[in-house]
Amino acid sequence: MKKIILSIALAMLTLTASAVPARRTQRTLTLSDGTQVTATLSGDENYHYWKTADGRAFVMNEENIPQEISLQQAQSKLQAKVQARNAHRIAKRTKHKAAWGAETNPISGERKGLVILVNYKDKKMQHTQAEYNDYFNKAGYSENNCTGSVRDYFLSQSYGKFSLDFDVMGPVTLSKNLSYYGDNDSDGNDKHAAEMVAEAVKLAVSGIDLKKYDWDGDGYVDQVYVVYAGYGEHADAPANTIWPHEFELSEAAKYNDGPGALTINGVTIDTYACSSELRGSSGNKMDGIGTACHEFSHCLAIPDMYDTSADGENFGMNVWDLMDYGSYNGEDGYGETPAPFTSYERMYCGWLTPVELTQPCNVNDMPAITKEPVAYLIRNANPKFPGEYYLLENHQQESWDAYAPAHGMLILHVDFNSNAWKQNTVNNVASHQRMTIIPADGKLSHYNTAGDTWPGTSKKTALTDSSNPAAKLYNLNSNGRK
């Protein structure tokens, strides 16, 4: 179905009328007593653990042996670490990038990104600078089953309005072995990842004009991106590999990791992101582009749309958004064809102006979101809550949506809150997810996404206050109802 027809009774008028998350990898853990359990990786770079179906939790200790802790303890540690780090990061982000927590952040034209390739003393990259220059910049890049390069991705999402070009440096060779930088502490977190980044920066950027990587003239490089040799811990690689993440050198130093922010030739490097050269835990295939696209989207002040809380179970945007699990979409499930930006993110960046609907109507012949800047918006008619609205967008299984689980209309429910966006907690409250979907089949499930679109497998063609699922609000509408 290339063109969709959906009758929308505009319920919102009177109620009649958004680091990458852990790849959902399973592993058989051998415990100290020799017994084995099957567990799924949970959490993110802040704190991660292995969770079994019956609710047991394990972390890999410094000897790479599974150590059982209570699930509550694991979640409490993650929550405490996130809160402590967020308190510092929020202040830093809002000081140096006012767009964090803003309703819009229009961006267009050309920007430059800095990428550094890294060898460890005992582990060298299997792919060359030329290959990575193609990976980040080449038009129509198709190696390793990718749908395009990182530059292609942003050009496409912006409908040609925003070009992100990359300077790829290196590889540089670090002074220590892989196991030093990726060694885990007792909580399973990398001890020296920021030290790796700082050392790489010092080796790579001597004599370079860093001002071209400062997008807003605040004296800070918006992000330096490091690709390190070998595998990443997020995809079931050994515990002494590094978990891809975004962080600040200044914040890492507070955890005794690295020297802090670096000021070179009058420009400061603080925010960094990093990811692995290779996908999975075996073979020599380059990782997909999804993680790089996700991390550079943070430079646009776009928050994570997955549940960043300790539990991490909320649906969020799941496979439908680059800023959630969609960063892994692709033929092999490693981000070769990451999910496209939603209409919300395109609207936020100034690349799409939705058509606002104010009367009940039929929505016909909507072009795919990957092809044309078309979406429809239905706002809560209560003027006290202008940040709550529905967005309607058409997804077809082609282009960046080629690996979407279904085709048809996707209905997003947005309830913008500046603090939630600023604190990177958009979808952390199960009963009030602020950037999620209304699935046609009524099932918000990580493992049942084929029925999310309209009409979809459930053949639903109407969304009203009495339909199933029903059009609901978080805030009172103009009639005093939700």
How should each PLM-predicted stretch be described?
Residues 2-8:
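Sec-dependent signal peptide recognition
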Residues 3, 19-107, 355-356, 367:
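N-terminal prosegments of processed precursors
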Residues 10-18:
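Hydrophobic h-region of N-terminal signal peptides that target proteins for export
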Residues 92-140, 177-190, 230:
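Fold-level signature of zinc-dependent metallopeptidase catalytic domains
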Residues 100-107, 148-265, 375:
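Active-site-proximal segments of metallohydrolase catalytic domains
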Residues 137-205, 273, 277, 326-360, ...:
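Divalent cation-coordinating acidic motifs and surrounding scaffolds
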Residues 151-153, 223-404, 415-417:
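Extracellular hydrolytic enzyme modules, especially secreted metalloproteases
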Residues 369-482:
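Extracellular low-complexity, Gly/Ser/Thr-rich intrinsically disordered linkers
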